[in-house]
């Protein structure tokens, strides 16, 4: 019996030294056994408590990491794009003389949502639709737009070249506004103000007066490389869709551009980058790119988050945009530029 007790205690508490000869007083042995078992049970309880505590810490850490991952993924998700992609015919389209009524009519037939036009002020204060300050490239004549009246400019023929099927003439902005107003199904215009010298104020005032006269603010968009022109239009009509136009020869975009009171940013194709599209999207600022000629690049830009394709080929852009929309059913904040969803 003594030997059995000795072996039991040795197994229960190997570190304890027992008497070589068992005490004939069984009460002493029972006390020893009870003490050893209490210590062992205490040790086992502490060990298992520590294990469960470690497991609890691990479980809590796992839950915390999962929660953090979900938060990060949710927080890093870009905001929805402001409006669906729009097709904008650059100066109308390439298939007729630029900035003329036939070019805009053709752009409309090819599915453009808007036709981009350039507006300057003639010598008699009339907003006319022409890009260059001199007519040498278009007409082969050394004629300054700012030094000529609207009637004189309209009388100068613009010979057809390239894809154009007919000669053109320089229209007034009013003539194009009347064309848009005549049919609500016709595309709108993206009017770019191009003031010369110190002519920003009179040009902006003349454009404002005409658009108000025809009540077409909701069907037009406006932009300029001249910040005064942008601010003038936006201050007069906060509800109009007004953007800033940036070009690569001006250098890198100023970081202050994100503080401009504008509805969109139009950039030259060479300025477009993933960083720029991410920044614009984080600011909920639609990004338009000009001028895009290649269908593959059009699709690439849409996938990057560009929502305005300004192109000489509105037919290409229409096909690319429609195919993209068919495969991408994302939600947008607005139904169209300046229009609630």
State what each model feature region is:
Residues 103-121, 258-265:
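Catalytic domains of carbohydrate-active enzymes, especially glycoside hydrolases
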Residues 90, 107, 118, 153, ...:
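Conserved, mostly hydrophobic/aromatic
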Residues 40-53, 58, 243-341:
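C-terminal active-site rim and adjoining tail of enzyme catalytic domains
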Residues 74-95:
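Ser/Thr/Pro/Gly-rich low-complexity linker/stalk segments immediately outside membranes or between
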Residues 1-52:
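Juxtamembrane transition segments at transmembrane-helix termini in multipass membrane proteins
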Residues 86-88, 114, 186-190, 219-222, ...:
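Structural preference for beta-strand elements that scaffold enzyme active sites
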Residues 57-72:
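Hydrophobic membrane-insertion alpha-helices, especially the h-region
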Residues 131-241, 283:
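Metal-dependent phosphodiesterase/phospholipase catalytic core, i.e.
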């Amino acid at each position: 019996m003594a030997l059995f007790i000795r072996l039991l205690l040795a197994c229960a508490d190997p570190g304890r030294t027992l008497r070589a000869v068992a005490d004939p007083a069984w009460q002493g042995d029972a006390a020893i056994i009870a003490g050893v078992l209490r210590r062992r049970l205490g040790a086992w309880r502490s060990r298992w408590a520590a294990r469960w505590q470690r497991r609890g810490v691990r479980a809590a850490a796992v839950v915390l990491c999962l929660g953090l991952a979900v938060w990060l993924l949710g927080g890093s998700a870009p905001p929805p794009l402001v409006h669906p992609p729009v097709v904008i015919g650059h100066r109308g389209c390439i298939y007729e003389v630029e900035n003329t009524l036939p070019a805009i009519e053709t752009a409309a037939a090819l599915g453009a949502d808007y036709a981009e036009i350039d507006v300057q002020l003639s010598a008699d204060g009339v907003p006319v639709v022409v890009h260059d300050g001199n007519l040498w490239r278009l007409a082969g004549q050394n004629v300054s737009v700012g030094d000529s009246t609207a009637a004189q400019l309209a009388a100068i023929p613009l010979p057809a070249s390239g894809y154009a099927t007919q000669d053109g003439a320089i229209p007034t902005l009013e003539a194009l506004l009347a064309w848009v107003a005549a049919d609500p199904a016709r595309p709108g215009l993206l009017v770019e103000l191009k003031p010369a010298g110190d002519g920003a104020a009179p040009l902006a005032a003349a454009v404002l007066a005409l658009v108000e006269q025809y009540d077409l603010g909701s069907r037009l968009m406006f932009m300029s490389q001249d910040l005064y022109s942008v601010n003038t239009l936006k201050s007069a009509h906060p509800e109009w869709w007004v953007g800033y136009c940036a070009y690569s020869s001006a250098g890198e975009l100023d970081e202050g551009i994100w503080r401009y009171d504008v509805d969109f940013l139009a950039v030259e194709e060479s300025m477009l980058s993933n960083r720029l599209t991410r920044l614009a999207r984080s600011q909920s600022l639609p990004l338009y790119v000009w001028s895009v000629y290649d269908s593959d690049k059009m699709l690439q830009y849409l996938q990057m988050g560009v929502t305005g394709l300004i192109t000489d080929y509105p037919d290409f852009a229409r096909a690319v945009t429609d195919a993209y929309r068919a495969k991408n059913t994302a939600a947008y904040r607005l139904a169209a530029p300046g229009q609630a969803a």
